């Protein structure tokens, strides 16, 4: 009788339940995996066989066929190692079939049977709960991520041997319990506005932008503080709600950029890619599309320094995501949509040498060169940037003065109040 274990695939930002069927067939001993598996899934044959033996269990001397259904969904990554191994163990008679009822299983296996980190645990856990599963076996280091989903029993698995002992009733594994220590340091620590001398009009413009969710373009000579001001922007944005935090964490989990020990991102992202980035790196892409920088900046700030130095194609592909707050990527293997509700902060020099209009250093660019440099940014893209502001050089007296500026916390309070008023206004429209 075939063994049936349930696992999960991630397609875009959503999970898809995968039924792992394991059965014997006639032929020489070995294992065949069908159901549109990629190379990593095909390689699980060797990992599973060695891990089962190293767990002290007998591996059947039969020809084993593993079917991953639905066959129309491409299966990628090593997350199917653990469910395949569990299916083999059940098929061999080491465990009854009922031990995996209402259970979702994911995890990569090492040759010694240790269960390794798997990306995309959060959307998998959300899919498990949405489909009525009561329990989920996950790698021990990913348990905090899965535990963010309520009403789902999360069992942290350290090794295949431990999982077998748990299901056999020999040594039970306690369900994971979330604690306050799960909320660790933020991914990015913004600069405090109180540490920035001068530029009061720019600070005010950024406050208005934060209150209204506007995109900003700062133009100024080198050393005027554009980067410092941009890095302070996340500090005045309102704190994320739990729904927004889960939304952001889901993207980082799928992109495998969630730091170890940080199951939930509570602070707004700040992404600052280099101007040599490709358009696929910025908006997402690849043969099997993955989130790009604009999706990793979802609910946060995307800072593009040296704005005109980005490739024309790279900048132009941002126009649709800036309007729709999502990016749709079409490939031969399918079309995926990623969230991209970011706030753009762009910075640029006024000319190629950087000192056009500077109060101290003269510009060496010809008028035609200045015009050509500024036209690297197309009109349609500039139309999507609501606030354009000049950032002049700060004079020595302000830099050396003792006056402390207003803190980010105080500004954030006004920004939050403005957004609350907007919510009330929209409710009465």
Task: Give the positions of each predicted feature.
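Basic, amphipathic alpha-helical bundle interface domains used for macromolecular binding and assembly
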Residues: 34, 40-45, 58-60, 67-77, ...
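Peripheral, non-AAA+ core regions of ATP-driven protein-machinery
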Residues: 1-217, 221-227, 330
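Walker B catalytic acidic pair
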Residues: 299, 305-307, 317
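Short beta-strand elements
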Residues: 18-24, 282, 386-389
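Catalytic P-loop NTPase motifs of RecA-like helicase/translocase cores
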Residues: 112, 304-311, 354
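P-loop NTPase nucleotide-binding/switch module
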Residues: 170-208, 212, 239-294
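Walker A/P-loop
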Residues: 217-260, 324
